[in-house]
C-alpha cells in the first residue's frame, strides 16, 4: 500500500528529475538514479541514517520520468524497496561491494536483524554514465544545481539524524565531492567541522569529519573502495553513538 507521505515525496521529486533530464538533454549515455530506502525507514525509528555515495557505477533506468515515478510499474525507480538490491540471489551488493560492506557493518550496529530495512541509499550525483564510472566534470557542473536541490529535498523530507557522505577525498574536483552540497545546505557557506576522527593508523590523513547543519549531523569520509573496511565502519559507528 502506498501511503500519502510517499505520494507527497513523489510530487516533490518528479519535477526536479524533469529538470535533471533537461540538464542532461536526455542523453542516453547518462541515466538517472533515484534514492532507495528500506520498508522501515519511513517509520519513526530510533536511529535514522541516510547513506550517500558519489554516483551510481553503472545503472539501468530511463529518462522517461513518468515511468520512473509510476507506482504501478514494477520496473520503476521511485519507491523501489532497497531489499531487492542487497538480498538478491547472488548477494553481489554486499559480498563484492566495499561500499555496501561498510554500510552493512554500520547498520547492523543499530539494527542487527534485517538491517537493510532501516536505511536509505542515494548519491550526490543523480545522473551518471550508464556503462559505469563517475560523471565527467562537465556533467557534474551542468547538473550540480539540480543535484543540490534533490539532495536538499531528500534530507528535508526524511529528516534523518545522520547523513553519511562517502564523498570525501576523491582524486578529482579538488579532492572532495561534499563541499558543494554542504555549502548549499548551509546557505552558501562551508560549515566548520565540529568533530574529526582518524580511522586508519597507517594513513593518519584518513579522517572523517562531522558537520552539523540545522540539527542534522553530516559525517563526511572517504569512499570505502580500496580502504580498510572494519576500522572505517567502527569509527563511523562510534561517531554516530557520540552524537546520538
Named regions from a protein language model:
Residues 44, 54-55, 123-124, 165-170:
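Short, well-ordered beta-to-alpha junction loops that form the rim of enzyme active sites
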Residues 1-95, 144-154, 205-208, 242:
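Active-site and ligand/interface coordination hotspots across diverse enzymes
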Amino acid at each position: 500500500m502506498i501511503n500519502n507521505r510517499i505520494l507527497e515525496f513523489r510530487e516533490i521529486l518528479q519535477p526536479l528529475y524533469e529538470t535533471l533530464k533537461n540538464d542532461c538533454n536526455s542523453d542516453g549515455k547518462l541515466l538517472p538514479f533515484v534514492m532507495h530506502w528500506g520498508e522501515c525507514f519511513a517509520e519513526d525509528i530510533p536511529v535514522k541514517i541516510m547513506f550517500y555515495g558519489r554516483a551510481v557505477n553503472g545503472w539501468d533506468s530511463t529518462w522517461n520520468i513518468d515511468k520512473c515515478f509510476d507506482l504501478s510499474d514494477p520496473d520503476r525507480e521511485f519507491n523501489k524497496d532497497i531489499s531487492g538490491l542487497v538480498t538478491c540471489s547472488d548477494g553481489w551488493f554486499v559480498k563484492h561491494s566495499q561500499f555496501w560492506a561498510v554500510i552493512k557493518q554500520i547498520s547492523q550496529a543499530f539494527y542487527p536483524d534485517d538491517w537493510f530495512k532501516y536505511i536509505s541509499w542515494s548519491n550526490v550525483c543523480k545522473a551518471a554514465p550508464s556503462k559505469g564510472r563517475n560523471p565527467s566534470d562537465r556533467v557534474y557542473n551542468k547538473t550540480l544545481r539540480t543535484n543540490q536541490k534533490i539532495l536538499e529535498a531528500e534530507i528535508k523530507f526524511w529528516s534523518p539524524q545522520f547523513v553519511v557522505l562517502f564523498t570525501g577525498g576523491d582524486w578529482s574536483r579538488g579532492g572532495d565531492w561534499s563541499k558543494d552540497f554542504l555549502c548549499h545546505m548551509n546557505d552558501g557557506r562551508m560549515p566548520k567541522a565540529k568533530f574529526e576522527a582518524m580511522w586508519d593508523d597507517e594513513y593518519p590523513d584518513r579522517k572523517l569529519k562531522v558537520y552539523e547543519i540545522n540539527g542534522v549531523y553530516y559525517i563526511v569520509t572517504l569512499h570505502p573502495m580500496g580502504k580498510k573496511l572494519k576500522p572505517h565502519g567502527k569509527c563511523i559507528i562510534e561517531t554516530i553513538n557520540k552524537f546520538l
